[in-house]
Regions:
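N-terminal localization/anchoring segments of enzymes in phospholipid and broader phosphate metabolism
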Residues: 1-361, 365, 369, 393, ...
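A short, conserved beta-strand element enriched in hydrophobic/aromatic residues
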Residues: 294, 377-378
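C-terminal structural cap/anchor segments
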Residues: 399-459
Length: 523
């Protein structure tokens, strides 16, 4: 029986890997490479007399594309990646570039998203949002920038930090039980198991009690985690459900425009975000990668309004009908009286559909304004030159820059890529630690005991450029002390990375890392 279960598990794993390849850019690149090899072979075999014209035409085409790339405003690192692909695949590299840049499969999504934002951008502020002129000098510039992107700064909000998904889950269940009007869930991953089962039990109870419940999860879940018709199953239970951007072979790229956000909103009064999804590994009931270190944050008060608005906007991106006039009933919520809470809170989102790199700008602002320390937890380290330069410059001007990453990787390629950045960071005084008990999935920045971010945004190209993300920025809030305390506690379970660690890396890791770094911006 056990052998049969293992065989089924291996088949499912193989099926999932195959589907990911078919849906992803990897599949496109492999097919392009095979076709080009066949094309070149045919050229050599049957068109020997025309080869000079072929090479001449290919060279002219490549030169034209290179000139076009020089003229556009893409990130320079991404441009270099395309130069490399075009050098190897001069003809089909162009086809791949056009396929990804025109993105025909997502044109409707892009138009709809921009239309929704245009019609709802004035809904973000509330009466208690803070005017920029009243903000402390250390917050004013960043708050002004985020406000221009649709994310106002709030007071009258209590933040509660959770150093583990296990801790957050109990509170999430308690708050779900208190729901009286509506529950909104938006998650990158929903997977059947104990965690989702407990949540679903409460959702069914609340639906029967007349509470409106909406669930949205990313389309990648349908690859191997949930049945493709799972939304219909939930709808039969009275739960409104949408799958964001369902995957379609060669129409949608596997990595583009994924909804990587994690948002739970209850009655517009309590909101959760952070690194945890609705799957058992996030509360350490599954241990494929050792102990799962993740974090979350709960907001109670006015700032929940921004999380609610972000959810409603993304929900309508996947809807056939859009009714912005209905938003008010979920946004204009009378908050219960509470003691005045010091500090400021800015929930914010990031989108791959505009030119505002909100997630990266927030991180860079923290790093560049740090005076004493910047402490970071991130599962992945696949950065552009701007981020590397900011980290190294901060360390060289005397700021303590410490990074905590996993010691047990969930993706070998990502882990190998992270190690390619270690040497430059170490040479410039950045301290790197790896969490020895297992995998760090937390996305946390904390600096100078004054500012912190807890959210979904990794230090990699996917999060900073290709995904929908969200985070919560805290300034002079009491909970920042608990975030820093958790960082220091986590350090006690880490091994410090040094040149010896890099020297002892397996040969394959040393080979894979530099090779994959060439195309890292597209991964």
């Amino acid at each position: 029986m056990e052998k049969e279960d293992n065989r089924i598990l291996l088949l499912e794993k193989g099926k999932r890997k195959l589907i990911q390849i078919v849906f992803g850019r990897t599949g496109i690149i492999i097919v392009s490479l095979i076709v080009q090899i066949l094309f070149l072979f045919a050229g050599f075999r049957y068109l020997e007399g025309f080869l000079p014209y072929f090479w001449g035409g290919s060279s002219l085409l490549s030169a034209a594309v290179v000139l076009f790339l020089f003229g556009n405003d893409d990130n320079p690192t991404i441009k270099l990646t395309w130069f490399f692909i075009l050098a190897i695949l001069p003809v089909f590299g162009l086809i791949l570039y056009i396929y990804i840049k025109t993105d025909l499969g997502h044109r409707l999504m892009i138009r709809r998203y921009n239309d929704i934002l245009a019609q709802t951008e004035d809904l973000a502020p509330c009466a208690d949002a803070c005017p920029s002129e009243e903000l402390p000098e250390g917050l004013r510039n960043l708050a002004t920038y985020l406000s221009s992107c649709g994310f106002p700064c709030y007071r009258n909000t209590e933040a509660e930090y959770f150093p583990l998904g296990d801790d957050a889950f109990d509170v999430m269940l308690d708050e779900l039980q208190k729901a009286e009007h509506f529950i909104f869930l938006e998650y990158f991953i929903v997977k059947e198991g104990y965690m989702w089962g407990r949540v679903l039990e409460i959702l069914k109870e609340k639906v029967n009690a007349g509470v409106e419940v909406r669930v949205m999860y990313d389309g990648t879940c349908a690859v191997a985690l949930l049945p493709y018709n799972y939304p219909k199953k939930l709808q039969k239970l009275g739960i409104a459900c949408k799958m964001f951007a369902p995957l379609r072979p060669f129409v949608s790229t596997h990595y583009n425009y994924r909804d990587h956000r994690k948002i739970m909103v209850i009655d517009g009064k309590v909101g959760f975000t952070g690194g945890i999804n609705l799957s058992d590994e996030y509360i350490n009931l599954s241990s494929r990668y050792g102990h799962w270190k993740d974090t979350a944050i709960a907001l109670r008060g006015d700032a929940v309004r921004s999380l609610t608005l972000m959810f409603l906007q993304m929900w309508d991106v996947s809807s056939l009908h859009f009714a912005p006039e209905s938003y008010r009933q979920y946004l204009d919520i009378a908050q219960p009286p509470r003691e005045k809470t010091p500090g400021y809170v800015i929930p914010y989102g990031d989108s791959p559909l505009d030119r505002d790199l909100v997630g990266e700008m927030v991180y860079l602002d923290i790093i560049n304004r740090a005076n004493r320390y910047v402490h970071i937890m991130t599962p992945y380290l696949i950065m552009d030159n701007e981020m590397v330069t900011a980290l190294t410059y901060a360390a060289r001007r005397g700021v303590e820059v410490q990074l905590i990453l996993p010691h047990v990787p969930d993706k070998e390629i990502a882990f190998s890529l992270a190690h390619t950045y270690y040497r430059r960071l170490l040479e410039n005084g950045v301290q790197i630690y790896e969490y020895e008990p297992g995998f760090v999935h937390a996305k946390v920045f904390v600096s100078d005991d004054r500012k912190a971010v807890v959210g979904t945004i990794n230090l990699d190209y996917r999060s900073l450029y290709h995904h929908f993300e969200c985070g919560t920025y805290l300034y002079e809030a009491p909970e920042i002390a608990n975030i820093e305390r958790d960082f220091q506690q986590t350090l006690t379970h880490c091994v410090r990375a040094d040149y010896e660690l890099l020297k002892n890396d397996p040969f394959l890791r040393k080979l894979i890392g530099p090779a994959m770094r060439i195309i890292a911006p597209l991964l």
